[in-house]
Amino acid sequence: MKLSPKDNERLKIFMAAELAKQRKDRGVKLNHPETIAYISNWVCERARDGMDVAEIRQEATSLLTREDVMDGVPEMIDMVQVEPTFSDGTKLVTVHDPIRGDTREQVE
C-alpha cells in the first residue's frame, strides 16, 4: 500500500485519536498530544460525513472538558487547526478554545 504524505499524517492522527478514545473511555485523563489528536480526528471525520465548517467549529468545542484532560492542557491549547477533506475540497478548520467547560454538564 502506498500512502501519500497527507494520507500518512491522517493515519497517524487516527491512530493517536483511537488510543486517546480508549483512554478517555477508561477514565484516563488525556495529555496534550492525545487531546489534539482526539479533536483533530473528530473534525476530519465530520468533514468526511458532510458537515460544514461552521457546524464543525461549534460542535468541536463540546467534545472534551477539563475533567477529560490533564491539568494545564486546556491552557496549552488555545486553538486546533486541521485541514480535512470536504466534498468540495480541502479547507482549514480552526477550533478556538476547544476545551471550554469544567464538567460535561457545563458543556451541554
Curated annotation (Swiss-Prot):
Gene Ontology terms: cellular component: cytoplasm
UniProt keyword annotations, A-Z: Cytoplasm, Hydrolase
Name of a matching Pfam family: Urease_gamma
Entry's Gene Ontology molecular function annotations: nickel cation binding; urease activity
Source taxon at top rank: Archaea
UniProt xrefs under InterPro entries: Urease_gamma, Urease_gamma/gamma-beta_su, Urease_gamma_sf, Urease_subunit
Pathway(s) served: Nitrogen metabolism; urea degradation; CO(2) and NH(3) from urea (urease route): step 1/1
Enzyme's top EC category: hydrolase
Catalytic activity, as annotated: urea + 2 H2O + H(+) = hydrogencarbonate + 2 NH4(+)
GO biological process: urea catabolic process
Principal location listed in the UniProt entry: cytoplasm
Record's subcellular location: Cytoplasm
EC number: 3.5.1.5
Assembly: Heterotrimer of UreA (gamma), UreB (beta) and UreC (alpha) subunits. Three heterotrimers associate to form the active enzyme.
Family from the record: Belongs to the urease gamma subunit family.
Name of this protein: Urease subunit gamma
Source organism per UniProt: Haloquadratum walsbyi (strain DSM 16790 / HBSQ001)
Organismal lineage: Archaea, Methanobacteriati, Methanobacteriota, Stenosarchaea group, Halobacteria
Gene behind this protein: ureA
